[in-house]
Regions:
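Short, C-terminally biased terminal segments at protein or domain edges
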Residues: 1-73, 77-144
Length: 144
């Protein structure tokens, strides 16, 4: 059971959170897709062979996390160049994940349906990220 002090802290947190801007990196559709992709990668890689724990499993998870983390970090950068640099790093991690998807299928760690689902998810993430970058380049309300 929580006490009065904890309830007061929770109320302060809720009040602070309600004053935060409504548009955060979590609002970016590319980040949302990337996050869903990461969760799916974690789910699938739980079934990879134990001897891949520090190999493909670790690398695939790290690359998936990198996509969404760089979108989040890039969002907070002030200049277009900085934003685009982090989003470009995300695109590099997307390419890395494409490789791990193919490798996972070729090693029979995932089936054809899982392969297609992963590939579709990563392609959607890439398309959304490219569109977001195009908006930044065209200066659609993003600070220089």
């Amino acid at each position: 059971m929580i006490g009065v002090a904890e309830v007061q802290e929770l109320q302060k947190f809720r009040q602070y959170h309600s004053m935060m801007p409504t548009f955060t990196f979590e609002s970016i559709k590319a980040w949302q897709k990337a996050h869903a992709f990461t969760l799916f990668v974690y789910k699938l890689t739980r079934n990879y062979p134990e001897d891949e724990r520090f190999g493909l499993t670790s690398q695939f998870r790290r690359a998936a996390i990198s996509i969404e983390a760089n979108i989040a970090e890039g969002y907070k950068k002030l200049s277009k160049a900085d934003k685009l640099r982090f989003f470009n790093i995300s695109e590099g991690s997307i390419a890395e994940c494409r490789n791990y998807i193919i490798l996972s299928r070729d090693l029979n760690f995932i089936n054809e349906d899982q392969y297609c689902e992963l590939f579709y998810a990563i392609e959607e993430t890439s398309k959304l990220l490219k569109a977001y970058c195009k908006g930044i380049i065209n200066n659609s309300g993003v600070a220089d």
